[in-house]
Amino acid sequence: MGVVTYDMEIPSKIPPTKLFKAFIIDGDNLVPKVLPHAIKCVKILEGDGCAGTIKEVTFGEGSHHKCVKQRVDAIDKDNLTYSYTIIEGDVLADKFESISYHIKIVACPDGGSICKNRSIYTTKGDCKVSEEEIKLGKEKASEIFKALEAYLLANPDYC
């Protein structure tokens, strides 16, 4: 078993609290609305949205994958942090035990924010994570983030 970690930062014009509410708190409803080709729906299978909650994410027709189950590991609305782990699904295939994400949204002096994301891939056996897989993961995350940002900019009264 191996562990591969990468960090990514995405700047945004959206203030941190509004971005956290849209991306994390309302994300299960907003992402499928804004990007139905990427995410078809998100269902809570167990829990109330707090730590320990299990969600099923069904991907849209534009995705190479069908669905995943993810566990909410932590959510802190005051510090604008959120952590979750993919625990099941075809994304993991025979290569990964799990994939964890740790997100923190911080304020910028210009009134916007930066979304800091740490991704941790825990591999099965001697499997390796290629640079191409990391690049694709970053591109997908950036696509979703930028689409949500564009939606919020076009709909300033949201949240």
Predicted features and spans:
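Hydrophobic pocket/interface hotspot
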Residues: L19-F23, K55, V72, C115-N117
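Short, intrinsically disordered, mixed-charge
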Residues: K21-N29, K77, K146, A150-A154
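C-terminal helix/juxtamembrane-tail motif
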Residues: M1-G2, V106, E132-C159
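Coil-to-beta-strand transition motifs
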Residues: V3, S63-H65, N79, D110-I114
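Beta-strand/loop substructures that line and gate deep hydrophobic ligand-binding cavities in soluble
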Residues: S83-E143
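Hydrophobic/aromatic beta-strand elements that line small-molecule binding cavities or substrate pockets
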Residues: M8-I10, V68-A74, I99-A107
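Glycine-rich portal/gate segments that line the openings of hydrophobic small-molecule binding cavities
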Residues: L30, K40-D94, N155
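Hydrophobic ligand-binding cavity/cleft-lining segments
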Residues: M1-C50
